[in-house]
Amino acid sequence: MFYHIKELQYQAKPAHPDPVYAKKLQEVLGGQFGEISVMMQYLFQGFNCRADAKYKDLLYDVGTEEIGHVEMLATMISRLLDNAPADVQEDAYKSNPAIAAVMSGMNPQHAIVSGLGAMASDSEGYPWNAKYIISSGNLLADFRANLNAEAQGRLQVTRLYAMTDDPGVRDMLSFLIARDTYHQNMWYAAIKELEERERDIVVPTTFPRELEKQEVSYDLFNFSRGDESSQGRWAHGEAFDGRGEFRYIPAPIAFASAPHLKPAPMWLHNTVPPMSKC
């Protein structure tokens, strides 16, 4: 179960209202790599975890912290919308707040739909989507997805930090940036621990290697003009799983012939291929 404490994990007080920035901040709340996404991703990985108790507990720890980050951002967005839209529009638009909201760059749904509150959507008003989250049951795969989510999230928050000079907003964002720093390090540590325990880096580690076409397991195919990619570490030397040698293939060949499909049944009304001449 969850137990709510009314105090925020960290303060979320802007120095002044800014409905346009509130729209931008929606991205790290309800966007693909926003706090709702990582909250749901970690919690569902925790709900579904069948591995060690320490990993399940870690997922619950971080997932529950992310609930607090959702709360902080929702609070900040609501406060940025205080006195909006009328008090922040030019005199020419004050007689029509809806028009003023659109003309100023504010998200009109913040006034019409949520009543000056945050929404579970991104900066363009697109609703949060459960397809954003990954919970596969394979912790090595999932933790790598978590590391990417934290990296993308931190990147977006740092960009938002540069888009405002409000000291209160920057203060809260600096806290979130710091937490993302820890979370990236944390997931990296968990990934390395699992790699060492499973003695492999290729997911899934439990699939028998003899069942894959090992002749191409470590080949880089040059499928674009130029050969600059041959200069990378991924093109030569021992592979990082320790089970093969990287090879650069400058002129890849086809391993199969051109495919020819049978005509579809007539009742599907597909285009019929031309009849061959006798």
Swiss-Prot record:
Pfam families: Mn_catalase (PF05067)
Highest taxon above the source species: Bacteria
Matching InterPro entries: Ferritin-like, Ferritin-like_SF, Mn_catalase, Mn_catalase_C, Mn_catalase_dom
Gene3D superfamilies recorded: 1.20.1260.10, manganese catalase, domain 2, chain A (3.30.1530.10)
Signal peptide: none
Family statement drawn from the similarity comment of this UniProt entry: Belongs to the manganese catalase family.
Protein name as catalogued: Uncharacterized protein YjqC
